[in-house]
């Protein structure tokens, strides 16, 4: 082996170790992202990022600026990994088109779709109407919150939420902390003509829809 081959062999060894460590680092970044989503913490922490880069490179005697550039690139990729796991939540009244919009949007941006009502129906083996009629709204809301936690932890989905998911206070920081919230504010005249199947709280017709809209509109707006 000549001198050049020796240099290259050493670089190969270092690169192999770097690849292993990068994989480990990015896996940990995913776990940190999950923790942030579940605890409502922001992905961005610019001050800490500056401190991290400075601390990792301050003792270098050569190529410090190159190392700074590499660390900044690694941090950018780590944040991208975490952002890719953010959900896109669609919220709004029953009949506002959340499920249909979620499916279309998921296809457009190539992300999987999650529909909290459908997940509940599949798990319980009952329609939403049957769950309400058999077990009551409080039971449904508890199951809905559990379902939301699972969706938030998995991340990376376009999520069609149930119309009343934001009426449970503990759900709000989970949704806001684990993704982007979009309010589908459909015209009230369209909502009045929405189908009532699996929408037990609007089975009362026009008055029920108007009452529900008045009760929820500000919460939808504040969360989006």
Put a short name on every predicted segment:
Residues 1-86:
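Domain-level signature for soluble enzymes in the chorismate/prephenate branch of the shikimate pathway
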Residues 90:
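Hydrophobic anchor at the beta1->P-loop junction of P-loop NTPases
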Residues 93:
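P-loop (Walker A) phosphate-binding loop of NTP-binding proteins
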Residues 99:
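Walker A/P-loop
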Residues 115-173:
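ATP-dependent small-molecule kinase phosphotransfer cores
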Residues 155, 178-179, 223-224:
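Short, well-ordered alpha-helix to beta-strand connector turns
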Residues 177-219:
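A glycine- and Lys/Arg-enriched "phosphate-lid" helix/loop adjacent to the NTP-binding pocket
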């Amino acid at each position: 082996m000549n001198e050049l081959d020796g240099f290259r062999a050493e670089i190969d060894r270092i690169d192999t170790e770097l690849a292993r460590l990068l994989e480990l680092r990015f896996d940990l970044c995913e776990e940190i992202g999950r923790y942030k989503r579940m605890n409502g913490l922001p992905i961005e922490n610019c001050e800490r990022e500056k401190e991290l880069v400075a601390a990792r490179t301050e003792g270098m005697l050569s190529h410090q600026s190159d190392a700074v550039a590499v660390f900044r690139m690694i941090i950018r990729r780590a944040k991208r990994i975490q952002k890719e796991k953010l959900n896109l939540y669609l919220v709004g009244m029953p009949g506002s088109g959340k499920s249909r919009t979620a499916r279309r949007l998921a296809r457009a941006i190539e992300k999987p779709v999650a529909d909290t009502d459908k997940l509940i129906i599949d798990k319980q083996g009952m329609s939403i109407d049957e769950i309400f009629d058999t077990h009551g709204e409080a039971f449904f809301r508890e199951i809905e919150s559990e379902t939301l936690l699972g969706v938030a932890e998995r991340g990376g989905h376009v999520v069609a939420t149930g119309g009343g998911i934001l009426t449970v206070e503990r759900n709000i920081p989970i949704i806001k902390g684990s993704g982007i919230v979009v309010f589908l504010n459909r015209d009230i005249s369209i909502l009045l003509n929405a189908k009532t199947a699996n929408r037990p709280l609007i089975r009362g017709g026009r008055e029920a829809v108007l009452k529900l809209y008045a009760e929820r509109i500000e919460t939808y707006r504040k969360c989006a």
